């Protein structure tokens, strides 16, 4: 099995694992919101932090849509650079978000995880979209 053909399933699996963890955090975000608050908090503070986490998770889901669109349409499926970046970023995000979920990390750390592990691959995916559809280059 060549390296490029093993990158395709690896990319799909890490992307899907990251998506599953984000959805899990979305469903059970109350504990993470409580970890972001001081011991004595007001309902307004809870609502504010909950809204912040909902926005961050929603942006992440939008970035997943971009990356799945490029991957499943075949535009970047066999691009080695994008596949390696995506596998590394989403594997890192999977491990980091597991710690975020189970250790109750602060909510501000989620923005860092999202920017490096979700936004970076999505931006490179958009660049590949522009190169393929705008400049009519081959997807490889």
UniProtKB/Swiss-Prot annotation:
Presence of the UniProt keyword Membrane in the record: yes
Q: According to its UniProt record, what is one Pfam family this protein matches? A: TMEM107
A single GO cellular-component term on record: membrane
Give the residue spans that cross the bilayer: 7-27, 53-73, 84-104, 113-133
- In Gene Ontology terms, what is a biological process of this protein? protein localization to ciliary transition zone
Q: Which residues are glycosylated?
A: 79
Membrane topology term reads:
Multi-pass membrane protein
Main location, first listed in the record: membrane
The protein's UniProt keywords, in alphabetical order, are: Cilium biogenesis/degradation, Developmental protein, Glycoprotein, Membrane, Transmembrane, Transmembrane helix
- Top-rank taxon of the source lineage equals Eukaryota
Q: Where in the cell is it found?
A: Membrane
Q: Indicate the secretion signal residues.
A: none
Q: Per its database record, what is this protein's job? A: May play a role in cilia formation and embryonic patterning.
Fetch the PANTHER family from UniProt: TRANSMEMBRANE PROTEIN 107 (PTHR34341:SF1)
Task: Output this protein's name.
Answer: Transmembrane protein 107
Q: What organism does the UniProt record list as the source?
A: Xenopus laevis
Q: What is the lineage of its organism?
A: Eukaryota, Metazoa, Chordata, Craniata, Vertebrata
Q: What is the primary gene name for this protein?
A: tmem107
């Amino acid at each position: 099995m060549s390296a490029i053909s093993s990158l395709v399933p690896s990319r799909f699996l890490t992307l899907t694992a990251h998506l599953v963890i984000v959805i899990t955090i979305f469903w059970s975000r109350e504990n993470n919101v409580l970890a972001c608050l001081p011991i004595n908090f007001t309902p307004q503070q809870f609502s504010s932090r909950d809204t912040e986490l909902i926005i961050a998770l929603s942006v992440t889901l939008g970035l997943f849509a971009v990356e799945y669109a490029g991957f499943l349409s075949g535009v970047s499926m066999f691009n080695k650079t994008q596949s390696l970046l995506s596998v590394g970023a989403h594997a890192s995000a999977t491990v980091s978000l597991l710690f975020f979920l189970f250790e109750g990390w602060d909510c501000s750390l989620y923005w860092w995880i999202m920017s490096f592990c979700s936004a970076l691959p999505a931006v490179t995916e958009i660049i590949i979209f522009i190169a393929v559809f705008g400049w009519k280059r081959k997807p490889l």
